[in-house]
Amino acid sequence: MKNKYPHIFEPITVRRMTVKNRIVMTPMGTNYGEQNGEMSFLHINYYEQRAKGGTGLIIVENASVDSPQGSNGTTQLRIDLDNYIPRLFKLCESVHKHGACIAIQLNHAGASAMSSRIGMQPVSASDVPSKAGGEIPRPLEKDEIMHIVKKYGEAAKRAQNCGFDAVEIHAGHSYLISQFLSPITNKRTDEFGGSAENRARFAKLVIEEVRKQVGPFFPIFVRISADELMEGGNTLEDTLEYLKYFEKEVDVFDVSCGLNGSIQYQIDANYLPDGWRSFMAKAVKEKYNKPCITVGNIRDPQVAEDILAGGDADFIGMGRGLIADPEWVNKVEFGNVCDIRKCISCNIGCAGHRIGLNQPIRCTVNPAVNSGEDYMKTKVNKPCNVVVIGGGTAGLEAACTAAEVGCTTFLIEKKAELGGLASVISKIPDKKRLADFPNYMIHRASKLHNLFVFKNTAATVDMVKALNPDIIVNATGSVPTLPPITGLHDLVDKDGTNVATVLKMIERINEYPEDMNGQKIAIIGGGAVGLDVMEFFTERGAEVTMVEMLPMIGNGLDPVTKCDTNAKMAKYGVKQMTNTALQEVKNDRFIVKNPEGEIEEIPFDYGFICLGMRANTPVLSEIDEAFSNTNVEIVNIGDSKRARRIIEGTEEGRNILNVLARHDYL
């Protein structure tokens, strides 16, 4: 059968490296390494899973060429000493056996390092931090610059000896080479600063040294921030100009964008469309006639195919998409596109856990980032009936997982449609990508002949008993938190009133005009939900005020979403009232107490209560009582356990495997 995506599966040769298809796993930190900078075996398995899934080229996350000075993470890989060769060799061996090629990204963090981690003041081109509020770095002396140049060359030779097929030099994203290239962070007045040629000199020396060390047949990739997307930073036109100073020895440009201060474009926010950056790769390719990788929220294989067919890029780079589904390439090649578990670009488990919390990466849609779908190889050893109450993403994960290992599974959902809160929130235009996850889960459930779904059905004790359960999973989700505040319960979500929760707002979403210029919106609650409401109305021209009891709007958000929402609030002039508490609700105003203890009125045309969600357990206590004297185990998961994020519900749904094992079914 002819493949629908011929350009994706066309091999390509770069010097002596032939890549079997055009999908590149782009480098993205994981925190899976050992604390001494060595590859862990978990780490090796992570990359092998993606090679096994059909990926053509894997570019391993950035490895420090000069530790500790050049390291930016507690578990960052190192390639600055021969000690690290054995595990890196094992990595290459593990990837190669599946027919994939492998490169490693070489990096020096510069000012993106932290003194608390490296034990010294970070260094850079100048004494300018890599982001607002960052540490002030120490400008490098010329002899130090030349020392680092040599360290790049030594690291590249070491990579070649490990068995890597290529190296990538990181010259973007606010790391050291980027700090020299950017006029924001390079204020030098010597031969390494000032003009574009001078700012590109460090990159040129690094690339030339790497070529000298690896020889004429070894591919060199360079990752760039083609547009820094910050005031005073390099534009695409600026980048096209400075590339001429070092493009000669570069084989492939990995065309990214953004800096630390514009991280929502570097690690794409979820509203940015598939392939939105491809024009940047096209511009570089056209000017320098070099193969280019394009990146940027590419999840849909048709978008990837169209980019390649149109000549905008030669490779499709995917990072988070392959965290979400290591089998993406195989599923596309063998006609199983509907089975792809698409990344929803929430940035919670990857960027949030790694950058924000310094933890190993996780994934909202993939509860088994390392083990993939291996769990399906084991089936229950005796009959087991599992009843799941609630068809949101947590309940769907539990039901599908139980059915996939052979349980007879019953899913009871009181509404007409499955998907829960994720499906509801995805109706907000900027959140539409979120729908990919419940849609995938619903498709997954539809293929399981031992999973029986009852929609429009409220679970009762008698119904559950009739299904003869061995295990009951309660996943009944959450409802908005509505505290006992004067006027709130009389007005919120009532017909004819102007006060609503986010759920009622979404129900009325088509009633709000596109042009709301001059209308006032007041939002109580500055968390993720309140910010979703803010974005919806500011983009329609409304004047928005946000009220938050805590000292900061967006507390607990991942760094990408935080940066993005801060930029939007600044752009649209959102009034932020922090340390401010709601006292009373009226139909046209909120009465609040400000930080000084004074009472203020906030008038509005539309007011929204976004104080988070609380667990909803309408039948759990009855179920507990009815089965209290039996061997039936009852587990409560997702928001009905405690209102949190989708990621916790997905993981708890997959944990049905542990429940089955505890009862000797597995």
How would you label these PLM feature ranges?
Residues 303, 459-463, 645:
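Short acidic active-site motifs
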Residues 37, 71, 305-306, 329-330, ...:
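Short amphipathic alpha-helical segments
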Residues 435-481, 490, 495-519, 539-625:
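A Rossmann-like FAD-binding core segment of flavoenzymes
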Residues 1-389, 393, 397-404, 408-409, ...:
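Flavin-dependent oxidoreductase catalytic cores
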Residues 366-379, 447, 453, 481-540, ...:
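Glycine-rich dinucleotide-binding loop and its adjacent helix/turn
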Residues 100, 218, 290, 469, ...:
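A short helix->loop->beta-strand "cap" motif at the edges of active sites that frequently abuts
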Residues 388-452, 456, 481, 526-560, ...:
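Beta1-alpha1 glycine-rich phosphate/pyrophosphate-binding loop at the start
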Residues 533, 557-558, 637-666:
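A conserved FAD-binding loop/helix module that cradles the flavin
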